[in-house]
């Protein structure tokens, strides 16, 4: 009987569960780690980049995607599903700008996509998208914002969060780093150091290299939103700074 409920997207089990949605969320949790931090002067995303010796490194495959001038996102889970939804996000943002002559608010863009993701949990003959997202952005109403969404279509705003592999341990580390002495909103520079610590824990200290990390953040300069993508030498400097701090603490 359990297999009957497993194979039906739209039917609840006797325990009130939608197994296909839970399987989609599990698929998203097995992908590379992505960390998001809301800073007082920006928002930062750091994610694990898949590296293979046989891959052509001259053709980069970015994990962090720009959606419009104010918003970017990172997806974990099924890559093909993620590409489809990123394209959908860009279309929603462009359509809003065409209709209203201004950039779409961050939360509205997240909500619009989550409506689509939720619909796929109740359509017969379809399956949920196996992708979780972190969004970073800015709008004139709420300033800098960080959102997380999952395959069920649920979303929420965060000060710091993590999705993907070892997200539970990463969340504990974020709690320790940011809230152990009372929460104080970090600067972007401080957020970089926290992100490196978390990624070092999820990847392992010996595996933490600039080739395996992608870090980007958004800030405002005057009336312009500016996206920054860290170069490998900048990431290497952050890793070395984190390693030196560990040595001083351990000595």
UniProtKB/Swiss-Prot annotation:
Belongs to the peptidase T1A family. This is Proteasome subunit alpha type-4-like. The keyword Nucleus applies. The keyword Nucleus applies. It comes from Drosophila melanogaster (Fruit fly). InterPro entries: Ntn_hydrolases_N, Proteasome_alpha, Proteasome_alpha-type, Proteasome_asu_N, Proteasome_sua/b. Keywords: Nucleus, Proteasome. Its main location: nucleus. Testis, prominent after meiosis II. After meiosis, predominantly localized to the haploid spermatid nuclei of the 64-cell cysts, remaining during the elongation and condensation of the spermatid nuclei. In mature, motile sperm, expression is seen exclusively in the sperm head. GO terms for biological process: proteasome-mediated ubiquitin-dependent protein catabolic process. Gene3D superfamilies: Glutamine Phosphoribosylpyrophosphate, subunit 1, domain 1 (3.60.20.10). The proteasome is a multicatalytic proteinase complex which is characterized by its ability to cleave peptides with Arg, Phe, Tyr, Leu, and Glu adjacent to the leaving group at neutral or slightly basic pH. The proteasome has an ATP-dependent proteolytic activity. Signal peptide: none annotated. One of its GO terms (cellular component) is male germ cell nucleus. It is found in: Nucleus. The 26S proteasome consists of a 20S proteasome core and two 19S regulatory subunits. The 20S proteasome core is composed of 28 subunits that are arranged in four stacked rings, resulting in a barrel-shaped structure. The two end rings are each formed by seven alpha subunits, and the two central rings are each formed by seven beta subunits. The catalytic chamber with the active sites is on the inside of the barrel. It holds the Pfam family Proteasome_A_N.
